[in-house]
Amino acid sequence: MKLVIAEKPSVGAAIAAVLGANEKRSGYFEGSGYLVSWCIGHLISLADAATYNEQYRKWKYDDLPIVPQDWQFTVANGKEQQFSVLKDLMHRSDVSEIVNACDSGREGELIFRFVYEQANCQKPFSRLWISSMEESAIREGFSNLKDGRSYDDLYQSALCRAKADWLVGINATRLFSILYHKTLNVGRVQTPTLTMLVNRDYAISSFKKEKYHVVRLDAGGVSALSERLNDEAAAQQMKAACEKSQAVCTSLKKEKKTVAPPKLFDLTALQREANRLYGFTAKQTLDYAQALYEKRLLTYPRTDSKYITSDMQDSTKELITGLCSLLPFMQGVKLQADLTRVCDNSKVTDHHAILPTAEFLKAGFSSLADSETKLMTLVCAKLLCAAAAPYEYEAVTAVISCGGYTFTVKGKTTLCEGWREIEKLSRAASEEQDEDADPETVLPPLAEGQTFDNPAAEISERYTQPPKAYTEDTLLSAMENAGKEETPEDAERKGLGTTATRAGIIEKLISAGFAERKGKKLIPTKDGYNLAAILPEVLTSPQLTAEWETRLTGIAKGSDSPDDFMRSIEEMTAGLVKTYSAISEDKAKLFTPQWEAIGTCPRCGAAVYEGKKNYYCSDRACSFVMWKNDLFFQQRKKTFTKAIAVALLKDGKVKIKGMYSTKTGKTFDGIVLLADTGGKYVNFRVEQNRK
């Protein structure tokens, strides 16, 4: 009997169906000599600090740095039952071999190995490495299973990444949170991303616009522009000279240019385009793509490749033929598919580019939600564009001389629409306009030496423009390219984060209060500015990630030492703690809320502030919190107002009128007491004579 372990339940179900394991059990499928189960993502993770020492529950500078000598693991909250299922299956006497069917890549390897180690399993295991959930891909993968131990170096690379992130995250977060009296989440990827937002916002806010002038010359149906002029008097002089002179075309340059078809989508490119065209957040795009993948309509979405392999050319051309028949906007379009530009075995590591599946050709759009339809259309259109002919046009640059000054005008004329025809048709079908689209300007017939009498000149006043605020589209691009020049070509990961994690990083910055969305824009908050300002460059620069990826790539290849890498991380962490041992009193107040305290915490004496959903103690080490939706007040049909909270904190009691009695169905007036016993929840009780 073989036990197959997938990363997610939906993937496990798909594999079970292909293998004929059709008997549904609790947490797994069985049949045809197979048991098929799943991990529910990261089922096992590195244990938190308190697991090593109970005193670490309280954050104290004297305990830093926290460096485990014997790393421990823990089952993720809410996933204990599934781990128990896997452990029991691994130790079943009739199971002779295990197949690691988790996602093909560094993290997928880590997910399986953590479960394998935590279950103390010693049985041999093999590796399933596939990029599509189609039946044919699964069957082919099982006929070519790899030796699981041949991926040991990849696992060591993944393990080092996890431990290093734990060490830096735990210690840096505690260190700066202790110093500044506020929980400040610090991470190797999150912090440099925040810094990019801060730097861009600062560049915008500190930008000083400068006025300049441009003279437009209208001659023979052509509008040519002068160079930028900072002096208005010079512009007036140019205008006056031109209006008295004859204009002459002194130079006419025509150049045929070709724009190659676009590459296929990896996840980041798909997220960027979906944000630009539809306003989808990166997380929304990932969620929609994952749902389509689980429906077998889309190939694996968390890929960082924009290419396919040579053995996929025939099947991909069949896809293209099917799409031309399926998609209404392709009716009447003649497409001679050429996949040469997107076929490169060397640029496909874990997974190939995102593609529609053969299953999609059968199912179509009928069962899809609007958001899924939009995303699926983008993927289909990108494949068709990638296989189409290049876009060809003639670029024309004319120089017009007049009154001793020169003016330039540029235009272009399309010679062959190529892939742009498909892009335009797909955009029109979805009624979406690409704001970044380059408009076509066709110039009237011109010739060198051609003269124009009575030209008109006009001065326009313009201003220099500040940089644009980041959108998720442009931030994803910046994350993808950050530190690339310092990262080796063959590194598994480049830039900040991965195709799969960048969306989560953006969401974390927003939920932690360090950034916010304003329309499509991503803007840092005041706390975001302050956090970026107080942290050392080693934590705010992408360089750390670049250095790590260089080392982790070496470990995955077996050319670098995991022990040496971890030793360097421990030294860096210890150096941070030693360097930042104390700060001034003024700096310690950087993150103090601007609003007034509503009272004093009855447990620790710190200030209590009002939040959106609660009244909470400002000392993060104290667990005192009063929830606005507390059942005590809901049952009595009273709103837990700020005035009530103030009175309870000041006097320990408050008189409230018109409380509802669930026993009598009537209202009454009474005194509510703050009956705090120091536990997880704050209690209240009524003490009064009912009227």
Regions found by a protein language model. Give the residues of each.
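Phosphate-rich ligand and nucleic-acid binding surfaces
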Residues: 223, 253-254, 324
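C-terminal or mid-to-C-terminal helical accessory/interaction module adjacent to the motor/catalytic core
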Residues: 137-219, 254-258
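Intrinsically disordered, low-complexity regulatory segments
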Residues: 1-162, 166, 466
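Basic, low-complexity terminal or inter-domain segments flanking catalytic cores
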Residues: 2-3, 79, 90, 173, ...
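Conserved short loop/turn motifs at secondary-structure junctions
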Residues: 1-3, 101-104, 181-183, 254-263, ...
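Metal- or metallocofactor-binding catalytic centers and their adjacent structured scaffolds
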Residues: 232-265, 271
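Amphipathic alpha-helical transducer elements in NTP-driven molecular machines
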Residues: 9-16, 33-36, 40, 76-87, ...
